[in-house]
Amino acid sequence: MEIDDLTGRELDMAVAKHVLGYEVEERIDTTTGEKDAFSRPRGQGKGWVRVASYGASMGASLNVEYELQHRGWRRRVTGTVKEPTTLAEVILDHRDGRSVKAVGESRGQALCRAALKALAK
C-alpha cells in the first residue's frame, strides 16, 4: 500500500513502527474483544500498549513532530484549511535541504504521511 493511501489504524501502525521505532503487533484487545494494534519500545520486554491514534489525535501527533525534529526535520507553516472539502497539507523541510509534502483529511493525517515519506528517503 502506498503511503498516501494509508488511513486509520494502518497509518497509526506504520508511524509507530517506522517513525517512532516501536515493535508493533495486531492483537485482540482484552477490554473490547476486538482486534487492534499494540506497540512497545524495542527491547522493552513486556509493556505492550495500544498504538496511539497519531493521525487523528493532535496530542499523539506531537510525538511524531518531536521525533521528526530530533531527526532534523521541521514542519513548514502553511495556510490553514479554509473549506471543509480542502485537504490539509503538511510540508517538511530537512536541514540538509530535502523536503517532502503530504496531504490528508486532517493535519494529523497529513503530518503522519509526510513523516513516513521523510524517513523513507
Annotated model-derived regions:
Residues 1-121:
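Glycine-rich anion-binding surface patch
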